[in-house]
A protein has these predicted regions:
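C-terminal membrane-cytosol helix-exit motif in multi-pass small-molecule transporters
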Residues: 1, 5-26
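Juxtamembrane intracellular "pre-TM" segments in multi-pass secondary transporters
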Residues: 21-46
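Extracytoplasmic gate region of multi-pass secondary transporters
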Residues: 40-85, 89-93
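Interfacial helix-cap and linker-helix signal at transmembrane-aqueous boundaries
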Residues: 68-69, 101-102, 157, 185-193
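Structural signature of the two symmetry-related core transmembrane helices
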Residues: 109-124
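Paired small-residue
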Residues: 121, 132-140
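Intracellular juxtamembrane helix-capping segments at the cytosolic ends
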Residues: 146-160
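A late C-terminal transmembrane helix in Major Facilitator Superfamily
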Residues: 161-192
Length: 193
């Protein structure tokens, strides 16, 4: 059975070799160097946005199964499925919603609204007297953080048109640092309290 499933990534790998990859900058232009990026204030704001996007996304998704177990009174196996699944479904819904209606919406307003919703969901998670209500907060947080990562990339491509591959690699790095640092910070703070 494992050999049959191994065929899928092999076929995908072969298929991917035939996919044309568009360049990020026009022919004849040069992309921004890392030094130029580091001197740009907008770049640092985008890096902070990505750091926070990763931290807020993973900080909650790591705890969603615990809230599902306690809030619904289910086994660890069911909690591990229900909590992260609710988070992921709403996160995907947010991205699908913006993908469908994004041409009619202002990205800045959508991201600001999502940030406010994220703060509300964090307050709900941390201050609610019931684990079930905290689980609902986790799910809502999934919806609120859904646009943060792709929205930050979209803003970066609009703000730094010559950013090139270096820009997106560094933004992804900031997001990954947030993804590892967010749950660590949540665990540290919850351990103190």
């Amino acid at each position: 059975m494992a050999l049959i499933w191994a065929i899928v990534p092999i076929v995908n790998g072969i298929t991917f070799t035939k996919v044309p990859i568009a360049t990020l900058i026009e022919e004849g232009e040069t992309g921004m160097t890392i030094r130029e990026l580091c001197r740009n204030k907008t770049f640092w704001i985008l890096m902070l946005m990505m750091l926070c996007a990763g931290a807020s996304e993973q900080g909650v998704s790591q705890w969603a199964s615990t809230f599902a177990e306690q809030g619904l009174g289910v086994t660890k196996t069911i909690g591990d499925l229900a909590g992260p699944m609710a988070f992921a479904i709403l996160m995907g819904s947010s991205r699908a919603f913006y993908g469908k209606f994004g041409d009619r919406m202002d990205l800045d307003k959508f991201m600001i609204g999502s940030s406010i919703l994220c703060i509300i969901s964090y307050l709900c998670i941390s201050l609610a007297p019931s684990a079930f209500v905290s689980l609902i907060g986790c799910s809502i947080c999934g919806f609120s953080v859904g646009i943060m990562w792709p929205g930050s990339f979209s803003k970066a491509s609009m703000a730094l048109r010559r950013g090139g591959t270096s820009l997106f690699a560094l933004l992804a790095l900031a997001g990954d640092v947030g993804c590892s640092g967010g749950p660590t910070l949540v665990g540290f703070v919850s351990g103190i309290l």
